[in-house]
């Protein structure tokens, strides 16, 4: 019985430590160490909040850059964030990807099938990726410039400014946040 009480006490101590203290220490660290103090980075346009930079949104109009397709619920439903778990041999998945390629080519007639970035037709693991690679952004420059009546050089310059370098220069890859890029386009009107 003596061993049981010691074990029970130790279990309670570890439960409190790992469910409260550990999380509190991580939260305090995030408040000082990370960008945005561990909180969401809110994107504003003309004084109105248009979204959070760390959660992907659906953009389907030609005047906007598009992010990766989402498999999170119906569109970009953050409450249903998850991958589809469909593999490359799944007929339903292949049909979805083919349909996405056809849609992408319809809006980008200047590209061949081989030039369509895989990232733009396959959903991410979370289904809510806020970023695309610079190459995916540059592929869309011609469409966005034409739809907005802007020069390709102007739109490309906006993309160039939106490219974020890897963290500390070595962790990760270059990326473009789609929401921030589209907000920058709106400001450039």
Swiss-Prot record:
InterPro entries in alphabetical order: KdpC (IPR003820)
Membrane topology label: Single-pass membrane protein
GO CC annotations, alphabetized: plasma membrane
TM regions (residue ranges): 10-30
A Pfam family of this chain: KdpC
UniProt keyword annotations, A-Z: ATP-binding, Cell inner membrane, Cell membrane, Ion transport, Membrane, Nucleotide-binding, Potassium, Potassium transport, Transmembrane, Transmembrane helix, Transport
Recorded GO MF terms: ATP binding; P-type potassium transmembrane transporter activity
Location relative to the cell: Cell inner membrane
Subunit details: The system is composed of three essential subunits: KdpA, KdpB and KdpC.
Family the UniProt entry places it in: Belongs to the KdpC family.
Protein purpose: Part of the high-affinity ATP-driven potassium transport (or Kdp) system, which catalyzes the hydrolysis of ATP coupled with the electrogenic transport of potassium into the cytoplasm. This subunit acts as a catalytic chaperone that increases the ATP-binding affinity of the ATP-hydrolyzing subunit KdpB by the formation of a transient KdpB/KdpC/ATP ternary complex.
Protein name listed in UniProt: Potassium-transporting ATPase KdpC subunit
Organism: Phocaeicola vulgatus (strain ATCC 8482 / DSM 1447 / JCM 5826 / CCUG 4940 / NBRC 14291 / NCTC 11154)
